[in-house]
Structure formats: structure tokens, C-alpha cells
Amino acid sequence: MAVPKRRTSKTRKNKRRTHFKISVPGMTECPNCGEYKLSHRVCKNCGSYNGEEVVSK
């Protein structure tokens, strides 16, 4: 079996893991009510999407 010859240093480990990060979700302001919502999704506050009321409240 393959066994590491040297211990992996903290620096080398951290450099390898630079791309393992959580991305921030794209938040936009709802043009209807002004609340922040996720992009390309129905607004939870007023139920509108793309200027039309999709979910009645």
C-alpha cells in the first residue's frame, strides 16, 4: 500500500483547501415590496416573481 513519505504541513494542507469554501447566495431586492430575496425565486414576503403575483397571500 502507498504510504506518505512525509507528513503534510499545515501550509500545504491549507493551500490545497483554498477552493473549499461556501459561496454567498445571490440576494437581490424585490422590486415589488423591497425585501431581499434569492435570485430567480419567488419572493417569500409578497409572493411575486418577475412583476407578477404567483403566490396569493
From Swiss-Prot:
User: Mind telling me which GO cellular component terms the entry cites?
Assistant: large ribosomal subunit
Which is an annotated Pfam family here?
Ribosomal_L32p
Matching InterPro entries = Ribosomal_bL32 (IPR002677), Ribosomal_bL32_bact (IPR044957), Ribosomal_zn-bd (IPR011332)
Q: Which UniProt keywords apply?
A: Ribonucleoprotein, Ribosomal protein
Q: Which family does it belong to?
A: Belongs to the bacterial ribosomal protein bL32 family.
Q: Name one GO molecular function term.
A: structural constituent of ribosome
Q: Which gene encodes it?
A: rpmF
Report the protein name in the record: Large ribosomal subunit protein bL32
Q: What residue range is the signal peptide?
A: none
A Gene Ontology biological process term: translation
